[in-house]
Each structure stands twice: as structure tokens, then as C-alpha cells.
């Protein structure tokens, strides 16, 4: 079933976008460039190849790290500024 948008949810989405854009539009990486501690602690149980979906990946620190581990990663985030930084981090790391 398709979701019906109402003006309230659209306003909420726009304010959320503004909030995340404000967070990620700065030059520095809000959470750094290294992966989340929990994700990194799971390295031993990750497959050596395959696909991964990094949802709400922000500036890409987790998705890029997963790609460095040999996975084919799709990284998604709500913020265009975060997506831009994620692509830059991936280029910097060669993945």
C-alpha cells in the first residue's frame, strides 16, 4: 500500500532534513572517519565478500569501512551533505 503524505509529515521531513544538513554541512566529520566501535568489533564474523547495505550511514564511516573489508556496499543517508562527504571519504580510502 502506498503511503499518503500529509502536510504535517512533509513539514516534519523538511525540518529533519534541515537538522541533518546543519550537522553535516561543516568541514569536519561529525563522528570521525573510523567505524562505529560495535561494527569494528564484529570484524571477525563479517563475510569476506558479498553485499552490505549501510542505512543512515551519515558521512560514510561505516560503509567505507565495510568496503575496505571487501564488501560491495550501498550507503544511503537522508542528508545530501553527508552523502557528499561519504563519497569523498570513499575516494580518500580508495574504495
What is the role of each PLM region?
Residues 2-47, 49-58:
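Conserved class I S-adenosyl-L-methionine
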Residues 48-49, 69:
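Residue-level preference for short coil/turn positions at secondary-structure junctions
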Residues 72-77:
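Conserved SAM-binding motif I beta-strand of class I
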Residues 91-95:
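S-adenosyl-L-methionine
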